Amino acid sequence: MIGTNVIRRNANFLQVIKSYYQLTKPRIIPLLLITTAAAMWIASNGQVDPVLLLVTLLGGTLAAASAQTLNCIYDQDIDYAMLRTRARPIPSGRVRPLHALIFAIILAVLSFTLFVVFVNMASALLAMSGIAFYMLIYTHMLKRHSPQNIVIGGAAGSIPPLVGWAAVTGDLSWAAWALFAIIFLWTPPHFWALALMIKDDYAQVNVPMMPVVEGEESTVEQIWIYTLIVVPFTFILVYPLAASGIVYTLVALVLGGMFIYKTWQLKQNPLDKDLARSLFKYSILYMMLLCTGMVVDSLPMTHEMIAAVGDNLNTLVSLIPLH
């Protein structure tokens, strides 16, 4: 009997831990961390301090988890109204809103403290600004009131590379703001592809996402426009900023070409949810691989290999007889 009670208590404890973990929407966080890490690698010329990297990513994780938890508290009414989200911790009754608020505050305080003590004040303030912008501007002011909610609100998701850059340098350069702009421009096609998939859910709770207000065809047209803007804009890191080189250029060309192709497919069939799902999934892969390209391009080893290839080519050219 005692053993059974212990097992039950352990199971209940694990269920509580799982519920609080779910409040943070953990599937969203890795992409934010990847953009943070990419900025740190570029800012450090491929020689980022591993301890600084780990501390910054941990602080970023805590800040993002706090923001998502606060979002769950604010949106508990629409989460309960939608069948897809009714099982989330707060609408299902597994976590009380007050307890979730305390949890979110603890996460934010830990994040801020970690940044201030082990990184710098600039990164700490930027991380907190991300939480504030996400909650006040996107969640409170825009999400339920404007079909342009994700366009402006996307700035919150664009802050992580600023945090990463500031963690390394203590300030922000044009390259840091270029990374911010790339993610800002990428967010609408990424999120609207998702909104096309779950349009009915948003309509049910009167959230004016673009597909609900303007319809699928207009939304896809906007996705097409933003894609045609963001893909060429990614090359600003190469010229004129010279923050990235040939490896990143090749990666951005291939990934951008596929991004445009998938958006074009959806443009031909704007009502096709499978194509919207395919674009949504690819947009995640696109950003992950684009950031990976930034990291690889920044490494000293990459520069040495490119220089060696260039020297070998020059040697071969010099051996060609001229007549």
UniProtKB/Swiss-Prot annotation:
One of its GO terms (biological process) is heme O biosynthetic process. Keywords: Cell inner membrane, Cell membrane, Heme biosynthesis, Membrane, Transferase, Transmembrane, Transmembrane helix. It is found in: Cell inner membrane. Its EC number is 2.5.1.141. Disulfide bonds: none annotated. GO terms for cellular component: plasma membrane. PANTHER family: 4-HYDROXYBENZOATE SOLANESYLTRANSFERASE (PTHR43448:SF7), PROTOHEME IX FARNESYLTRANSFERASE, MITOCHONDRIAL (PTHR43448). This is Protoheme IX farnesyltransferase. The lineage of its organism: Bacteria, Bacillati, Cyanobacteriota, Cyanophyceae, Oscillatoriophycideae. The gene is ctaB.
